[in-house]
């Protein structure tokens, strides 16, 4: 960046054990872990960020790590489940498109807990179950705390936006 000091530069990390995070952190940039990664892969980003910060001689601060997730909140579980998993759901559309593209380009590994799993065994339902946080406010809060427990401390939770099939429900979710 030509401007000194420059605004914060934040890069998206989409791969498990991302080498891009190492390089970004070494340049003084900070990571966003993509919303479509399994938690086990999100967790691999912190050590890579630390590695890059150490290379640059700067402290690794969890406050600089952003984690993106797909989140939908409703007043009751049935409404949340229907909105997220319905055939016309923007969440289903997003993850269906993403899974189709990743499989086509040999990247279905992003959705696998076990890398020996066959690509055909990676289903849309499995990906949605793993990647979407949904439910009542209490359930979603508990799931976010569980995310933090699993992946470690991070600074900012980013909600990955989806199209609004129902404006009132989408606005309420925010």
Task: List each model region and its residues.
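Hydrophobic faces of well-ordered beta-strands that scaffold small-molecule active sites
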Residues: 9-12, 29-34, 63-70, 155-159
């Amino acid at each position: 960046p030509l401007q000194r000091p420059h605004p914060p530069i934040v890069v998206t990390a989409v791969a498990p054990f991302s080498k891009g995070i190492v390089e970004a952190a070494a340049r003084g940039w900070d990571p966003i872990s993509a919303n479509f990664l399994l938690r086990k892969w999100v967790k691999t980003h912190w050590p890579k960020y630390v590695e890059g910060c150490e290379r640059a001689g700067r402290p690794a601060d969890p406050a600089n790590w952003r984690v993106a997730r797909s989140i939908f909140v409703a007043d009751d579980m049935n409404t949340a489940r229907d909105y997220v998993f319905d055939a016309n759901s923007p969440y289903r559309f997003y993850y269906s498109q993403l899974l189709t593209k990743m499989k086509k380009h040999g990247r279905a590994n992003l959705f696998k807990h076990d890398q020996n799993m066959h690509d055909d065994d990676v289903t849309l339902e499995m990906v949605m179950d793993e990647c979407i946080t949904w439910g009542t406010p209490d359930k979603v809060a508990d799931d976010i705390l569980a995310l933090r427990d699993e992946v470690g401390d991070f600074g900012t939770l980013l909600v990955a936006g989806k199209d609004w099939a129902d404006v009132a429900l989408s606005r309420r979710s925010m």
